[in-house]
């Protein structure tokens, strides 16, 4: 039986491109795990993708997942475009390579062990506590980026010792 995990993600960028941050919250029953990471030069779309990737890659076992995001780019890409891109060798309709192909491939790999029950859109800045918290963490990470390049090695800026470990 899969553990049922809810994931909330957000990305932020101060300029596009510019310093950026990503953040997420993973919920399992009464437990919660938060993360954030900042990068010196990136884009808002890369941060939205990285938030989902970091969350999914942090899970040690296969889980049933509902992922919430305010990013239409992430949600439309993963639910509609990705299968077409893969079928066409990661190229768009005009035969150009998909933007952020490195992260789309990484996200595609990250979802494989899991049962993704749903990808859900949340309108941003409407008061949903987990979405607002992710936004706050992502913006803070963008203000204090610790990675010189987008090197896929996030530095955790926030980690509550009382939070759960999802095994």
Curated annotation (Swiss-Prot):
GO terms for cellular component: cytoplasm. It comes from the Bacteria. Binds 1 Mg(2+) ion per subunit. May bind a second metal ion at a regulatory site, or after substrate binding. Mg(2+) 1 binds at residues 10, 48, 70. One of its GO terms (molecular function) is RNA-DNA hybrid ribonuclease activity. Pfam families: RNase_H. Its EC number is 3.1.26.4. Residues 1-143 form the RNase H type-1 domain. This is Ribonuclease H. It comes from Blochmanniella floridana. The lineage of its organism: Bacteria, Pseudomonadati, Pseudomonadota, Gammaproteobacteria, Enterobacterales. The gene is rnhA.
């Amino acid at each position: 039986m899969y553990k049922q995990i809810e994931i909330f993600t957000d990305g932020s960028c101060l300029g596009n491109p510019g310093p950026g941050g990503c953040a997420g919250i993973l919920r399992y029953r009464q437990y919660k795990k938060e993360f954030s990471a900042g990068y010196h030069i990136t884009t808002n779309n890369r941060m939205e993708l990285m938030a989902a990737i970091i969350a999914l890659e942090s899970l040690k076992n296969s889980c049933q997942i509902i992922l919430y995001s305010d990013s239409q780019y992430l949600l439309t890409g993963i639910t509609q475009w990705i299968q077409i891109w893969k079928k066409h060798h990661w190229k768009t309709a005009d035969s150009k390579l998909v933007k952020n192909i490195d992260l789309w491939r990484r996200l595609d790999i990250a979802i494989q062990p899991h049962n993704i029950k749903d990808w859900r859109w949340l309108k941003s800045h409407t008061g949903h506590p987990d979405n607002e918290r992710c936004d706050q963490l992502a913006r803070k990470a963008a203000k204090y980026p610790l990675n010189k390049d987008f090197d896929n090695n996030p530095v955790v800026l926030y980690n509550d010792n009382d939070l759960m470990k999802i095994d």
